[in-house]
Amino acid sequence: MSKRISAKHKIDRRMGENIWGRSKSPVNRREYGPGQHGQRRKGKLSDFGVQLRAKQKLKGYYGSIGEKQFHAVYVEASRLKGDTGANLIGLLERRLDAVVYRAKFVPTIFAARQFVNHGHVKVNGRRVNIPSYQVKVGDVIEVREASKQMALVLEAVQLAERDVPDYLEVDHNRLTAKFNRIPELNEVPYPVQMEPNLVVEFYSR
């Protein structure tokens, strides 16, 4: 088992939810967390515990973003006008690796991060290899010509159901995606409920 698959399984098991909607998620087979003490019955979480869990779930969904980087995203969200929770989701969905994942150019958020890191993606015609790069409205993201025949890409596109979110305009033949607008929370296709308001409460303690 690769480290990325192991990490995904751990996150699902710890959360007790299939946060990416994968058919092979371990929570489809059992309801307890990872480790030797995973089968113990969980007590009711405190308010802090509920907030922490919401933060860990959101961090995990976007590929286990490090705490320092995730907190920096929250700080930026809190400085923007409007609802901080909505701003947080908007900033996370503007990450280049998230856009590549949403466009279904690769199968997972973990693969998207590696794909960007290895220089397979261009934004407005220029190569960008920073997964956290903030895509702007109107930007065009594309897979580099030399990378379009990679097995990872071909398999992902072949399996894609084309149900990309409305805020992206995707051409799977050309492997391009235009970021049309910053999404609202209810537009983001999360397989499970995300609660950015609890994340805001966690950091506002």
UniProtKB/Swiss-Prot annotation:
Signal sequence region: none
Molecular functions per Gene Ontology: rRNA binding; structural constituent of ribosome
InterPro entries according to UniProt: Ribosomal_uS4 (IPR022801), Ribosomal_uS4_bac-type (IPR005709), Ribosomal_uS4_CS (IPR018079), Ribosomal_uS4_N (IPR001912), S4_RNA-bd (IPR002942), S4_RNA-bd_sf (IPR036986)
Domain of life according to the entry: Bacteria
Mitochondrion listed as a keyword: no
Gene Ontology biological process terms in this record: ribosomal small subunit biogenesis; translation
Record keyword Magnesium present: no
Keyword annotations: Ribonucleoprotein, Ribosomal protein, RNA-binding, rRNA-binding
Residue ranges constituting the S4 RNA-binding domain according to the UniProt record: 94-157
Region feature Disordered, mapped onto this chain: 19-45
Gene Ontology CC annotation, any one: small ribosomal subunit
PROSITE patterns linked: RIBOSOMAL_S4 (PS00632), S4 (PS50889)
Family of this protein: Belongs to the universal ribosomal protein uS4 family.
Subunit structure: Part of the 30S ribosomal subunit. Contacts protein S5. The interaction surface between S4 and S5 is involved in control of translational fidelity.
Function as written in the Swiss-Prot or TrEMBL entry: One of the primary rRNA binding proteins, it binds directly to 16S rRNA where it nucleates assembly of the body of the 30S subunit.
UniProt protein name: Small ribosomal subunit protein uS4
Lineage start: Bacteria, Pseudomonadati, Pseudomonadota, Alphaproteobacteria, Hyphomicrobiales
